Amino acid sequence: MVKDILAPGLRVVFCGINPGLSSANTGFPFAHPANRFWKVIHLAGFSDRQLKPEEAEKLLDFRCGVTKLVDRPTVQATEVKLHELRSGGRNLIDKIEDYQPAALAVLGKQAFEQGFSQRGIAWGKQKIAIGATMVWVLPNPSGLNRIKTEKLVEAYRELDQALIMRGL
């Protein structure tokens, strides 16, 4: 099981869709070697060095956290069922209300749309918020996602800059 890494007062909580098999086997988030999460958050400015999956708890040192919409591991996120995403969206709202980070970054447009019953959303900051928490949708860093790493970094950096502009 991949546990959440959450605490009050975080700048951002990154929300993946669900654990892949590598994460399920190791217990660490974004553990597959092809997953670009750790590289991207470092290059975007969220950490001062590239962490390894087994150092996930150190995210808290950078006021970042990690959670997921669905606990069930799969080979591909496309195997996650709609009812799991909807239930996960409700559970995620509860977590965010409890911890109140400055921002929630859901990693994947389709997962966000299905988990939050939204349609036709754009990348970036969303019109909805969870209390005082800004909601962002960023591209998923999975190695299965064809988006170039530079574009991922650009999208994540936009969130980092928005938080800096708010003094966070």
From Swiss-Prot:
Its EC number is 3.2.2.28. Keywords: Cytoplasm, DNA damage, DNA excision, DNA repair, DNA-binding, Hydrolase. GO terms for biological process: base-excision repair, AP site formation. Its main location: cytoplasm. It is found in: Cytoplasm. It catalyses: Specifically hydrolyzes mismatched double-stranded DNA and polynucleotides, releasing free uracil. PANTHER family: G/T AND G/U MISMATCH-SPECIFIC DNA GLYCOSYLASE, G_T MISMATCH-SPECIFIC THYMINE DNA GLYCOSYLASE. Belongs to the uracil-DNA glycosylase (UDG) superfamily. TDG/mug family. Excises ethenocytosine and uracil, which can arise by alkylation or deamination of cytosine, respectively, from the corresponding mispairs with guanine in ds-DNA. It is capable of hydrolyzing the carbon-nitrogen bond between the sugar-phosphate backbone of the DNA and the mispaired base. The complementary strand guanine functions in substrate recognition. Required for DNA damage lesion repair in stationary-phase cells. This is G/U mismatch-specific DNA glycosylase. The gene is mug.
